[in-house]
């Protein structure tokens, strides 16, 4: 089974446009997290009985760490718009401070204001108004306290980087990024050059969320990758 893992402020349904395009030979499940801490969400993934993990952004970071913690549980991993972490100490400290500031603000604000701020991020500037509107109900269904806890326990500054560990990951790994997302395109290529059985794929006409902007292209990349894994 393919387990689709959502990003921050998403429900599993955000993956539906891609999941519905996978062939029947790859049944899937869209994960709706009941837990809102890093360890809680990692536990959900590890107990899911999935053989393939597909995660976006935060979901990708979770997928990598699940695979590293229990590599024998999985046959392949796909990460989209994700990274193995921030290595530079000063940058990590800055990110922790920024995430804590945001978490404190989130705890004090209504979800409507939180979503409005989230949607104004430069990272999502290339997404169409229609795409943003389609994602909004899932974002508005989030609980602010849960979002704050997730930031504090699973933020990029909080989590230790796992670049070194990736060198020993004995699993097929596909790292996907949008061509308009320079930072995560670079991260995908680095993942591909670090893990021994990894490859990168850059999706044209897409930014940080290629699975939303180009779902058919992402579904095709995942299908080809899983076919290659199945064929040895």
Model regions and ranges:
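Gly/Ala-rich beta-loop-alpha elbow adjacent to hydrolase catalytic centers
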Residues: 55-59, 63
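Conserved HGGG/HGGXW glycine-rich cap/lid loop of the alpha/beta-hydrolase fold
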Residues: 1-36
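Short beta-strand immediately N-terminal to the catalytic nucleophile in serine-hydrolase-like folds
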Residues: 53-55, 80
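Conserved acidic catalytic loop of the alpha/beta-hydrolase fold
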Residues: 38-51
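The conserved beta1-alpha1 loop
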Residues: 3-7, 56, 177
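Flexible "cap/lid" loop of the alpha/beta hydrolase fold
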Residues: 68, 76-106
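Catalytic histidine-centered segment of alpha/beta-hydrolase-like enzymes
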Residues: 206-215
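Conserved serine/cysteine hydrolase catalytic core
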Residues: 140-193
